[in-house]
Amino acid sequence: MGQLVSFFQEIPNIIQEAINIALIAVSLIAILKGLVNLWKSGLFQLLVFLILAGRSCSFKIGRSTELQNITINMLKVFEDHPISCTVNKTLYYIRESENATWCVEIAALDMSVLLSPHDPRVMGNLSNCVHPDIKHRSELLGLLEWILRALKYDFLNYPPLLCEKVTSSVNETRIQINVSDSAGSHDFKETMLQRLAILFGTKLMFDKTPKQFIVIRNQTWVNQCKSNHVNTLHLMMANAGHAVKLRRLQGVFTWTITDAAGNDMPGGYCLERWMLVTSDLKCFGNTALAKCNLNHDSEFCDMLKLFEFNKKAIESLNDNTKNKVNLLTHSINALISDNLLMKNRLKELLDTPYCNYTKFWYVNHTITGEHSLPRCWMVKNNSYLNESEFRNDWILESDHLLSEMLNKEYFDRQGKTPITLVDICFWSTLFFTTTLFLHLVGFPTHRHIQGEPCPLPHKLNSNGGCRCGRYPELKKPTTWHRKH
């Protein structure tokens, strides 16, 4: 008997599914039959003939297409910035600007060109390394500092630099970096070579070779290599500075719709009248809890949050430590609620409505039984506000409740018989009816000379000649045909 009752209860769902299947079948059949009718009407053949057959006497495809390219060179945009290039990925050059007649060369060598006892060490100030008689001394000094800053060279922790001793006979600036493992840490060489690769945007050719020294010196620019704007961007990004990391305040507590053991609670919360609701026992389902999860801006959500925290804190510990747990729970509750209580206390002092977390109001739909998320009934002068004083709030809440009900009804109906499916069925049926009429009328597809075979792929004019000019005009009568 129970199975029979269950069967009769499922009959509406079975009928609804059958209607959906019927709508899908009708839509597919109408679309397929419509396409067949269009093909049989000759419309596709006529369009293909008009597009292809009259262009030329052959079927040449792609005669108006060609491969083209564009090269982007933004050196004019960065002409006042340092520009770099490379020669065989072993020598690197940096110019101060696009119009500079000098440059700085960076090379890796397997032998030292400067000696520590003879040449001075650099502890941070590069001005003693540049000869005072060198032209563009200030620009060269700035470019050297730019390079070392891009390499993130630490004068305090890295091996000291060696620079050419400034004399009256030497008018060249040379700086040497010892990248051997004996000079610094075991990975100092790999670190510096990797930074060079990042700086110049390429893989260094000497990263696996026994090169032990990096030498930086000034040179005259004689077009050693070709520059591009990508290398300039690498230099600019290497000297862009350090990004400031900001901290964003995250949520302190999170909670889900489960009990203390981690099991789902499909029934939601039932709050007793001594807890929140003063009239009687009221149950709030998962919808209210989901709203609190998405938008935590209600005093009711604050109470649910405290209630959930207390319950989990108490039920997850042993009964032998209940006193300590109670003390801990009260302390945490005080910390959590300090902000809320202080906010309401300030409102009370300012003689503005505040919440005492005792009485809550919500909008209830008497027919469906659905209700809105409870909101705090504000207190002013030690008495609850009259309903007329927050009339706009509960009217707006009722509008939101009706909107949610309409949306829910719409999605429920979409789950049974989607409106889109009905629209597809309607338009596919209309498409089939239109194509059926076109099939009955028919379209001519090409022109024939009376009594002659099919001239395809050539397109004839009214005088019987080939429109592309390959064949002379025969001045014979022509007629339109539907089939070949």
UniProtKB/Swiss-Prot annotation:
GO molecular function, one term: metal ion binding
GO cellular component: host cell endoplasmic reticulum membrane; host cell Golgi membrane; host cell plasma membrane; membrane; viral envelope; virion membrane
Keyword Transcription: no
Binding-site residues, Zn(2+) 2: 446, 448, 454, 484
Glycan-bearing residues: 88, 125, 178, 218, 356, 364, 381, 386
Keyword Methyltransferase found: no
Site (Important for GP-C-mediated membrane fusion): 33
Residue intervals annotated with topology Extracellular: 2-17, 59-423
Cystine crosslinks: 85-225, 270-283, 292-301, 355-376
Residues where lipid is bound covalently (N-myristoyl glycine): 2
Residues spanning the membrane: 18-33, 424-444
Keyword annotations of the record: Disulfide bond, Fusion of virus membrane with host endosomal membrane, Fusion of virus membrane with host membrane, Glycoprotein, Host cell membrane, Host endoplasmic reticulum, Host Golgi apparatus, Host membrane, Host-virus interaction, Lipoprotein, Membrane, Metal-binding, Myristate, Transmembrane, Transmembrane helix, Viral attachment to host cell, Viral envelope protein, Viral penetration into host cytoplasm, Virion, Virus endocytosis by host, Virus entry into host cell, Zinc
Cytoplasmic topological intervals: 34-58, 445-484
GO biological process: fusion of virus membrane with host endosome membrane; receptor-mediated endocytosis of virus by host cell; virion attachment to host cell
Site location (Cleavage): 58-59, 250-251
Binding site for Zn(2+) 1: 57, 458, 466, 468
Domain of life: Viruses
Annotated HAMAP family: ARENA_GPC
Function statement: Glycoprotein G1: Forms the virion spikes together with glycoprotein G2. The glycoprotein spike trimers are connected to the underlying matrix. Interacts with the host receptor leading to virus endocytosis.
Membership in a protein family: Belongs to the arenaviridae GPC protein family.
Record protein name field: Pre-glycoprotein polyprotein GP complex
UniProt source species: Chapare mammarenavirus (isolate Human/Bolivia/810419/2003)
